[in-house]
A protein has these predicted regions:
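A structural signal for short, well-ordered beta-strand segments and their strand-loop junctions
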Residues: 52-57, 91-94, 117-122
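C-terminal capping/extension of enzyme domains
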Residues: 103-158
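A polyanion-binding, active-site-adjacent surface
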Residues: 1-86
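Acidic beta-strand-to-loop metal/phosphate-binding motif
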Residues: 90-103
Length: 158
């Protein structure tokens, strides 16, 4: 699984079925797909049929402007996605740096079920193997140097 901030500009219809979403120029999902494809190539494994990457978010409102999205979220009755209750083989965090308005949302991921948590720490140019704190910088995929993340995921996949 991967945990971002919010769906940004991506748009999806409300549905109980798997459907294609309109990315509206949002780059997170294609970037995540490419990272995982490259990790599978690096460890010389085929991507299993019907596999998927669970994308979780701090909150689930679509808005490319994070400040607007936070305001909408604060005034909404938005629910947390029930997928957050699953057990994940590993979780990669890409929610960015410190933002006091997001701290409570980040805190709930301290209880998420996974044996392996990691994020790219660009300040130290390394992978950290823990859940990032509210003040840690968990590098977003935008302008991310992907090679360290690809290497790390490929080792998990072996």
């Amino acid at each position: 699984a991967i945990v971002g901030k919010n769906p940004g500009s991506a748009r999806g219809a409300i549905s109980n079925e798997l459907i294609q979403i309109d990315l509206q120029g949002d780059k997170l999902l294609p970037t995540v797909r490419n990272i995982f494809e490259n990790a599978y190539k690096k460890c010389a494994k085929e991507i299993p049929e019907n596999s998927y990457i669970q994308v979780l978010n701090l909150f689930y409102l679509c808005d490319a402007d994070l400040n607007n999205a936070i305001k909408k979220y604060e005034n909404s009755t938005s629910k947390i996605d029930e997928c957050e209750n699953k057990n994940f083989p590993f979780i990669c965090y890409v929610w960015g740096g410190e933002n006091k308005k997001l701290s409570n949302m980040k805190d709930r991921f301290n209880k998420i079920n996974s044996k392996k948590h990691f994020y790219l720490d660009p300040r130290n140019d390394c992978i950290k193997e823990n859940i990032p704190s509210n003040i840690d910088l968990a590098k977003h995929t935008q302008f991310m140097k992907q090679e360290k993340v690809i290497d790390y995921i490929s080792k998990i996949l072996k």
